[in-house]
Amino acid sequence: MGISVKDVDSHTFTKALAAFLKKSGKMKIPEWATIIKLSKFNELSPYDEDWFYTRAASICRHLYIRSPAGVGALTKIYGDRKRNGTVPSHYCRSSGSVARRVLQALETQKLVEKDANGGRKLTSQGQKDLDRIAAQVKEKTKSK
């Protein structure tokens, strides 16, 4: 049995997959990606210019581990607390538009497909790509 995504550190894998998605150049990033906040509980837009690739890599990893998942499930995962000033904080979901656009971009790359029962799941090609990148990450961490 080969190396899977579960065998490597999630942070290093997500960074490696984001670099792969950026290097492939096939993913279409929306023009509003530089000015948008990722949720209504954020005060600022992301500092990282490549946040779209990082979010796509994170969603791919999540779909590898827990598939299928829809837009609503992803908004729950990336949700956090909203600070209301003097009023107590409350949980708030993240942006559904961002999750939907990332999933659509991954569908154009043939990494993700719609599931018959609802939500999205990884394609066999997507699973192969993720396993290959996980093996590369494992090799890099071994050599250090």
UniProtKB/Swiss-Prot annotation:
Signal peptide range equals none
Keyword Acetylation listed: no
The record's Gene3D superfamilies line, in alphabetical order, gives: Winged helix-like DNA-binding domain superfamily/Winged helix DNA-binding domain (1.10.10.10)
Q: Name one GO biological process term.
A: ribosomal small subunit assembly
What InterPro entries does its record include? Ribosomal_eS19 (IPR001266), Ribosomal_eS19_CS (IPR018277), WH-like_DNA-bd_sf (IPR036388), WH_DNA-bd_sf (IPR036390)
Q: Does the keyword Transmembrane helix apply?
A: no
In terms of Pfam families, this protein maps to: Ribosomal_S19e (PF01090)
Please name the GO terms that the record assigns under molecular function.
RNA binding; structural constituent of ribosome
GO CC terms: cytosolic small ribosomal subunit
Keywords, sorted A to Z: Ribonucleoprotein, Ribosomal protein
Entry coiled-coil feature ranges: none
The highest taxon in the source lineage is Eukaryota
Which family does the UniProt entry place this protein in? Belongs to the eukaryotic ribosomal protein eS19 family.
This protein is called what? Small ribosomal subunit protein eS19
- Per the UniProt record, the source organism is Argopecten irradians
